Amino acid sequence: MRDNSAKGITAGSESQQTTYDPTRTEAALTASTTFALRRYDLAGRALYDLDFSRLNPQTPTRDQTGQITFNPFGGFGLSGAAPQQWNEVKNKVPVEVAQDPSNPYRFAVLLVPRSVVYYEQLQRGLALPNQGSSSGSGQQNTTIGAYGLKVKNAEADTAKSNEKLQGDESKSSNGSSSTSTTTQRGGSSGDTKVKALQVAVKKKSGSQGNSGEQGTEQVELESNDLANAPIKRGEESGQSVQLKAADFGTTPSSSGSGGNSNPGSPTPWRPWLATEQIHKDLPKWSASILILYDAPYARNRTAIDRVDHLDPKVMTANYPPSWRTPKWNHHGLWDWKARDVLLQTTGFFNSRRHPEWFDQGQAVADNTQTGFDTDDTDNKKTRLSKGSWLRQAGPDRPPVWSVLRQHWQPHLVRASAFGVWDLFVLIN
C-alpha cells in the first residue's frame, strides 16, 4: 500500500482527513514516479520513449523566413540550448498530445503537475498500483482509494453464490409510508450493508380510486437520495446559479458534517490547488503547453520550440465574455468580423473537467460584457500570430487547449484513418 501520509496526502477508508501539502507531495512524486511518452510508427511498433525528466532537449534553429531548419536525415538544426522554461515543466505529467496538421513533426503537449494527477486519482477513488509485496503469508495486497475502493489480487469470488438482495419491511404510521431497499454481499460477518435506494412518499387525502377498480394510491415524491441536484439557486435571486464545493461529494467522511454521521457518506469536494496559489507561482503549479518537434527517423529527432503556462485567473477573467456573448465594435454596431470569430470559438473551459484549477470548485462566467475593449479599434485575430496566441490572453480567443482542438481536430479526424492521431501514448 502506498504511504500517502508521507507524501502530504492522507487518504483511505480508515484515515478520513486529508492533509494538504502540495510542495511535499510534488517533491515525493517527482522522486518516485516516472511518466513518459511512447512513440509508435504507423505500423503500431513502439520506437522509443520520451521521458521529459531525463530528456536534454535543444531549441531548433530557424531560417530567414522563420521556418524551422529541418533535414529528413540529419534532423533539426539545434541551437545548443534548451528553452529557459524547460526546467519548469520537465517534471510535469503529459496528459494529452495533439499533432499539427500542417507539420507532421510538430506536437502540442498538455502538461500538469504530478500532485494534481495523484490527488485526482485519490479523490475519485481510483486504485493505484501496489508498491512492493505484502508482508505476511496469505495476506492479500489491497490498494484503497479515497472512496474506499478496494482492489484485490485475482481470485475466485466464493461469496458470489451467497449474494442476495434484502429489503426492510415497509412501515407505515400516521398516513405516511416509507420503504428502504438495501443490498448486502454475503461472506464474512464484517461486511456492512450498502444502501441502494431509499424513497420517502406520502399519501394524498382522497387518493384512493373509487371507479370500481382495486384501490390505487396516488403518491408524490417527497425525497430521493438519488435526486440531489449539484446546482443550487441563490437565495436572493431565483435566476442566479452558483456551483459550490458542497455540491460535489467524492470522499468518505466519519465526521458528522451536515447532520450526517454515516462514515460512508460523501463530504464536500476540496480543491488541491487554489486559483491564487497557481496565479502566484505559474511555473510550478499551472498547466503548461509544450510545443514539441519530433522526427522519429532523424539523427537529431527531438527539439523543443517553446513552453507556455496557463493562468486560470486570467482565463476566467477574460475568456467567458469573449466567446459567450454577442460581439459589438467600439461604435456600438454589430461587428460581422467578430461574429465570425464567435462562430469559430465555441469551446469552453469547464470547471468540472478541471476543478482543481478553481477556488472551491466554482467558476465565474460574466455574460454581460461585449468582450472587446472600447479603445481597441482593430479587433485583430491575434491567436495565430507567432508567439502570442499561447502566451497572452486576448479578447477574441477561447482557452488555449480549445483552440488547439478546434483548429486541429478536423485534420486529426481525417488523419486518424492512417494512424497519425495515435502516434503518442502516455505510459507510466
UniProtKB/Swiss-Prot annotation:
Region (Disordered): 1-25, 157-219, 247-271
Biased composition (Polar residues): 12-22, 206-217
Spans traversing the lipid bilayer: none
Low complexity composition-biased segments: 172-186
Origin superkingdom: Bacteria
Signal sequence extent: none
Family statement drawn from the similarity comment of this UniProt entry: Belongs to the adhesin P1 family.
The protein, known as: Uncharacterized protein MPN_101
Organism: Mycoplasma pneumoniae (strain ATCC 29342 / M129 / Subtype 1)
Higher taxonomy: Bacteria, Bacillati, Mycoplasmatota, Mycoplasmoidales, Mycoplasmoidaceae
